[in-house]
């Protein structure tokens, strides 16, 4: 699962990421765990920028889990239409609100096991909530983290959960949330799927990727 990335290399990696991205922040705008949960559900197959255009009005109208639980599907679909897959997302938001009300007293739960019982919530979304709302060390694996982890030799699998485990094994627990978010931002802006910016990459010396471009 891990392809030879040592503890010393992990330390160097985190040092370089801290230099490159000293203040990693979640791009999705939110003020509460419920808002971040909703925004993360909406972000599936959608840009964070687009979600951030939709959520101010949405959050003004839907303030509690009960508001989502009792939402009119047609109205909610219209409000989130621009995020794509709006029918499925509206259905998940309504069902999610209903589960929060019926099982969790309207509050976003604080454990992985509980979070992944919510409609539309997988490990990635759960880890976003745990790490950013509740201070629980959590490794978020999205398409950017997956790509960077594979290119750096941190993991040699396509399975997100296995990549999560691989990163947990090689990175200090205290750095899971911050480090995985730095990897995400590095993948988004530097280690791109197409036209990676290898010549500007601080991680170049650590990178064993055969496809990397000359510095």
Feature roles, as predicted:
Residues 2-215:
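Catalytic cores of DNA base-excision repair glycosylases
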């Amino acid at each position: 699962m891990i392809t030879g990335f040592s503890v010393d290399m992990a330390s160097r990696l985190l040092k370089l990421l801290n230099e490159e991205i000293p203040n990693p922040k979640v791009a999705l705008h939110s003020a509460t765990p419920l808002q971040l949960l909703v925004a993360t559900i909406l972000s599936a197959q959608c840009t964070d920028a687009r979600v951030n255009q939709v959520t101010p009005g949405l959050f003004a109208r839907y303030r509690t889990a009960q508001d989502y639980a009792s939402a009119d599907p047609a109205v909610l679909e219209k409000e989130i239409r621009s995020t794509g897959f709006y029918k499925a997302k509206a259905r998940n938001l309504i069902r999610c609100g209903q589960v929060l009300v019926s099982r969790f007293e309207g509050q976003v739960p604080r454990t992985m096991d509980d979070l992944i019982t919510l409609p539309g919530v997988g490990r990635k979304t759960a880890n976003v909530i745990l790490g950013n709302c509740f201070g629980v060390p959590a490794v978020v694996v999205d398409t950017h983290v997956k790509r960077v982890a594979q290119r750096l030799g941190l993991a040699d699998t396509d399975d997100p959960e296995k990549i999560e485990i691989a990163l947990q094994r090689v990175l200090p627990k205290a750095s899971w949330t911050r480090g995985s978010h730095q990897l995400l931002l590095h993948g988004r802006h530097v280690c791109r799927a197409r036209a990676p910016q290898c010549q500007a990459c601080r991680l170049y010396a650590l990178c064993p990727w055969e496809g990397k471009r000359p510095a």
